[in-house]
Amino acid sequence: QSPIRSPEHPIPLPARALNGATLCVEQLAFRYPSRPDTLALSELSMDVAAGDTIAIVGPSGAGKTTLFQLLLRFYDPEHGRILLDGVDIRSLALHDLRNMIGIVPQDTVVFSANAMENIRYGRPQASDDEVIDAAKLAAAHEFIERLPEGYQSFLGERGVRLSGGQR
């Protein structure tokens, strides 16, 4: 059970944050409760402008996952703070915060379903046309059309019927 909770009176997200927000990470330091003698992050600072897309890369153990766990407030930092449009994320409702952050993990997840349903997973109410539009935006449409049954092709458990690059 996580001790992290939404504040009793959360601050609403600023209107412009709905279309992208500035991110300011100030002097973050963090230790996992299970490893109190080891700093997972030490004095991390960075600024990301609204609308920018960034990649967090580094060797195993560098703190990439830890940073995202702090951004999503699975933990709070020992020291420092994270601001979205100047608002400390500890002042935001967890639901609002987590809904505005997108993460692309290093390992893909492919469900035991067809291509259409795998894409639709991110937005269950999407129409077939919207799913196809999303595939086109992701430069996957032509590849999917070449599958034996197109969008209805079963991809196998964890995508075993696809190559690593196709996943």
Model-derived regions: residue spans:
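ABC-type nucleotide-binding domain
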Residues: I4-R167
